Amino acid sequence: VSRALGAESIFLGDAEKDVVGTLEEVNRTWGGDFQVILGVPWRKVIQDSKAEGRNIVHLTMYGMPLQDEVAELRGLSKLLLVVGGPKVPGKVYHESDYNIAVTSQPHSEIAALAIVLHEIQSGEELKRAFEKSRLRILPSPKGKRVVET
């Protein structure tokens, strides 16, 4: 989801090593240069991102409503979106520049990520073309049309 909707990279825990091969194959087939970074502690990711001038945006159902903050987020040029699970350390809330809620009800972290990426980019990510793709889908009202590039 993050790759398809315009993210440049994703940080994952070591337990998710199998994702790397899958995403490398997706890059080869469908284009793009999406990066997967494994095993970097969350605190270091946030510290390094801040040092690079990124704004830290934590997606949580306990944050400020996305619709109230999205205009400000659109004005930021460098973002790190933090998506946690049910047991996010409290320090993440305090170290983030923004704590943003898609809704104040339980929901999927992936759904929140997709909605935030879509809203921040005003839907422009849906028009994105991926460079160096081996395959490309041609829109079709019925059936599947895939061409080799």
Locate the predicted segments by residue:
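Short, well-ordered alpha-helical microsegments
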Residues: 19-20, 43-46, 66-67, 89-90, ...
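Short secondary-structure transition/capping segments
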Residues: 21-26, 69-71, 112-114
